[in-house]
């Protein structure tokens, strides 16, 4: 307890402003020999980054932790201001309690102050008394209330024990973190420190505990999500409760890039926040630029139908060639998967019904521009209104392709500059593939869209270009005017409007830390992912072509966990032959130089179409002829691919994987065909596995495991099939989270079935490359994580700094959660 005498209490003072009030308190402390006068500057420095107004007319100015060497002797000084002084907008301080504490001796003073915060009459008495002894007695605890104390609430039945580790106890900042966390759960939470019990959702109540370093707290909870709440709180205490005075200046996000869930970050930012979905991690500070497409105007009518028809044909042909050039450019810079969308756009331009309908309108006296605009707009509107999310999502592609033709049929009327010419954060309702292909990463520091989700085209491009991005922010995003300064936190899915200097400093610190972290990860990328307690997790890469095979090795991948062979079949007029496929597989094996590769057989259907294969139009393509079903119904393609794979297997460690297995019969048929092909080419046996991405496969996993060498869990499809949510859906994308407990329980069942059959389990998909997901999956027993190439080094580093025992405990607690948000709150 800090001794307080009347000499350090100034009664009946006035102050012109907050700085004057603090200066008077500093004078008292300096005159008493308690501090160096420069500590006053530290107190003002604290005010620049935090509000020290407690409430009920009481403020507690104190210095920054790095300036404690300016404190000679721990002390407090009180300046009474009966007339008050504005401390912050809307807050008037009448009792200024200046604290100069070397450690946690001041906690009892804070505890006594919290009693006053809940008693307006007592606060008024202290702000107007003419006797300094009254204030001294109240702050030192000598004037305890006379009334009999109320009965202390009992602990709830379910609880945990934690210890306060912070050097300065449970002071305001860590207590605020704890309150914010507790409020995220419906359960009632109580925290006991000896005889005192606090409401875990009340800052005042928590401060009243007076919990110093080393205090043993009993935390109990009651309610439907009590187990999850206690698990999250235990993890928060273990992590230090975001106490900057003990953990240093680095922002929490710098340690875990890629986390979605904006709650923790929002609580830390002072500026107004807009919340969306994390699309690409990282930070950006820049003015916004509102993306606007050029407007094309055209005449409604035209007299010469033949001339207008020729204009339409020429515009269609010109647009087709533009798309061809754009396809080739994107292929070179971003790979075939990114370029494939432009082939689809070319198909729109060849649609015979659209062209015929437009020409019919021209024959009725309409201009080519009017006719084409009417036709593609009507069809886009029809697509956008469809209930099927895949089809409705095509509307933006059709409008993009249609607009490309239209610009050759009318006059371009430019409003805003089409693309930015200075560094900015680009805002848009959504971006088409054509838009994103033209972005200059040197100027676009960040991306934010009102629509979309983490698997939208914009998000995929942002990650490929390493641009921080937030999607699905909503219409209010577009209320921001060009030039508005913002901070974009891609990992948290947050945009901070007009960030304060403290927000900017925090982001700049985090950016510097993130850069340093990535540089360290890059230097250590070839180290194995061996946990601190000796468990090995292999981190491999998802690839689509030879260039990515080379890049995966350079990135530190320990092999390829998923080769998407679809890229061999797209952007061409006929399927590749056996020798062509063999040459490509052999080139990949050469690039991997002995590292293993899992080759997934052709996986088309659903949202992956190949025009020349004449795939049937299905009402529900995701529930139709997908994956292995397509291969079994096109056995000639399947056998050709298997022959190429088996022939290539002589040159390296090849494993074969069948996609979208739903039933035992599918697997047995696929294995029979594969064995027939192997014997035909005279190849040695290779490991054969299946993807677990359909709930029926999970339920049949014990039987399936007896028939394969490994499982690979496709978390993206498993999530959408388990939750009945298309991960591309503009509304449901936010909820289609692979860390939902329902999905995790399916994964847990799969792993246990595999372990019983003594086969290994890998995972690919979004959560394998997510920091929380990697920890949970490894804790569940997944032994191989296949991630995007840019994520390899970071996931390996994270696993090297973790303990498998802790990951198993995290996984156990995650399985007990009821929502994805609870799971993400565990770590």
Curated annotation (Swiss-Prot):
Superkingdom? Bacteria
Q: Which GO terms describe its cellular component?
A: cytoplasm
**Organism listed in the record:** Rhodobacter capsulatus
**Alphabetical list of Pfam families matching this protein:** PEP-utilisers_N, PEP-utilizers, PEP-utilizers_C, PTS-HPr, PTS_EIIA_2
Q: Which residues form the active site?
A: 62, 171, 457, 764
What positions does the entry give for phosphoenolpyruvate binding? 564, 600, 716-717, 727
- The name of this protein is Multiphosphoryl transfer protein
- Where does the PTS EIIA type-2 domain start and stop, copy by copy? 2-142
Q: What does the record give as the reaction this protein catalyses? A: L-histidyl-[protein] + phosphoenolpyruvate = N(pros)-phospho-L-histidyl-[protein] + pyruvate
């Amino acid at each position: 307890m800090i001794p307080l005498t009347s000499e350090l209490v100034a009664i009946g003072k006035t102050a012109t402003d907050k700085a004057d009030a603090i200066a008077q308190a500093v004078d008292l402390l300096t005159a008493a020999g308690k501090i160096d006068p420069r500590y006053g500057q530290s107190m003002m420095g604290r005010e620049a980054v935090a509000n020290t107004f407690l409430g009920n007319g009481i403020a507690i100015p104190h210095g920054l932790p790095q300036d404690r060497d300016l404190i000679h002797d721990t002390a407090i000084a009180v300046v009474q201001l009966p007339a008050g002084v504005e401390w912050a907008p809307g807050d008037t301080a009448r009792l200024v309690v200046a604290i100069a504490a070397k450690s946690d001796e001041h906690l009892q003073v804070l505890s006594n102050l919290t009693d006053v915060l809940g008693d307006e009459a007592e606060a008024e008495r202290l702000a107007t008394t003419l006797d300094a002894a009254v204030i001294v007695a109240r702050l030192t605890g000598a004037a305890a209330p006379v009334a009999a104390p109320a009965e202390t609430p009992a602990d709830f039945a379910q609880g945990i024990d934690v210890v306060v580790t912070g050097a300065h106890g449970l002071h305001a900042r860590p207590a605020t973190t704890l309150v914010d966390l507790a409020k995220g759960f419906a359960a009632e939470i109580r925290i006991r420190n000896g005889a005192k019990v606090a409401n875990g959702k009340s800052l005042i109540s928590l401060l009243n505990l007076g919990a110093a370093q080393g205090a043993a707290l009993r935390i109990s909870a009651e309610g439907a999500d009590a187990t999850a709440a206690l698990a999250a709180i235990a993890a928060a205490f273990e992590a230090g409760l975001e106490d900057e005075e003990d953990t240093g200046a680095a922002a929490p996000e710098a340690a875990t890039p890629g986390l979605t869930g904006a709650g923790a970050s929002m609580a830390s930012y002072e500026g107004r926040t807009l919340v969306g979905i994390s699309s690409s991690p990282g930070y950006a500070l820049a003015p916004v630029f509102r993306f606007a497409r050029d407007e094309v105007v055209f005449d409604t009518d035209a007299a010469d139908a033949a001339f207008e028809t020729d204009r339409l044909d020429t515009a269609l042909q010109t647009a087709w060639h533009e798309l061809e050039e754009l396809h080739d450019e994107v292929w070179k810079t971003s790979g075939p998967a990114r370029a494939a969308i432009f082939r689809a756009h070319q198909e729109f331009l060849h649609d015979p019904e659209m062209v015929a309908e437009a020409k019919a309108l021209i024959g009725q006296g309409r201009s080519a521009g009017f006719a084409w605009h009417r036709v593609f707009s009507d069809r886009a509107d029809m697509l956008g209104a469809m209930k099927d999310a895949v089809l409705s999502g095509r509307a933006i592609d059709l409008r993009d392709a249609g607009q490309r033709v239209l610009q050759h049929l009318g006059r371009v009327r430019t409003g805003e500059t089409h693309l930015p010419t200075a560094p900015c954060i680009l805002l848009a309702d959504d971006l088409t593939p054509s838009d994103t292909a033209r972005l200059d990463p040197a100027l676009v520091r960040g991306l934010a869209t009102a629509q979309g989700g983490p698997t939208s085209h914009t998000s995929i491009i942002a990650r490929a270009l390493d641009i921080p991005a937030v999607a699905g922010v909503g219409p209010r995003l577009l209320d921001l005017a060009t030039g508005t300064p913002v901070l974009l936190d891609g990992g948290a899915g947050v945009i901070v409007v007009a960030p304060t200097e403290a927000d900017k400093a925090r982001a700049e610190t985090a950016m510097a830390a993130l850069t340093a972290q990535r540089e360290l990860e890059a230097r250590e990328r070839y180290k194995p992912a061996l946990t601190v307690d000796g468990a090995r997790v292999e981190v491999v890469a998802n690839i689509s072509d030879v260039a990515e095979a080379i890049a995966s090795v350079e990135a530190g991948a320990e092999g390829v966990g998923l080769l998407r062979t679809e890229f061999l079949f797209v952007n061409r007029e006929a399927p590749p032959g056996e020798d062509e496929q063999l040459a490509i597989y052999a080139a990949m094996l050469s690039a991997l130089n002995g590292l293993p590769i899992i080759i997934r057989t052709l996986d088309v259907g659903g949202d992956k179409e190949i025009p020349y294969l004449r795939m049937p139009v299905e009402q529900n393509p995701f529930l139709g002829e997908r994956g292995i079903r397509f291969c079994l119904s096109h056995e000639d393609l399947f056998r050709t691919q298997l022959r190429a794979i088996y022939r290539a297997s002589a040159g390296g460690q090849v494993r074969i994987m069948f996609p979208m297995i739903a039933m035992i019969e599918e697997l047995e048929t696929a294995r029979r065909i594969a064995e027939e092909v192997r014997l035909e080419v005279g190849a040695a046996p290779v490991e054969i596995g299946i993807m677990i991405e359909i709930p029926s496969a999970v339920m049949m996993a014990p039987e399936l495991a007896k028939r394969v060498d490994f499982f690979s869990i496709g978390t993206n499809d498993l999530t959408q099939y388990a939750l009945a949510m298309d991960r591309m859906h503009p509304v449901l994308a936010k909820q289609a989270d692979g860390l939902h407990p329902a999905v995790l329980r399916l994964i847990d069942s799969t792993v246990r079935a595999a372990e019983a059959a003594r086969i290994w389990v890998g995972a690919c998909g979004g959560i394998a490359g997510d920091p929380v997901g990697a920890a949970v999956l490894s804790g569940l027993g997944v032994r191989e994580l296949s991630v995007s190439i840019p994520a390899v080094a970071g996931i390996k580093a994270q696993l090297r700094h973790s303990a498998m025992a802790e990951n198993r405990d995290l996984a156990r607690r995650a399985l007990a959660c009821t929502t994805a948000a609870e799971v993400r709150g565990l770590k």
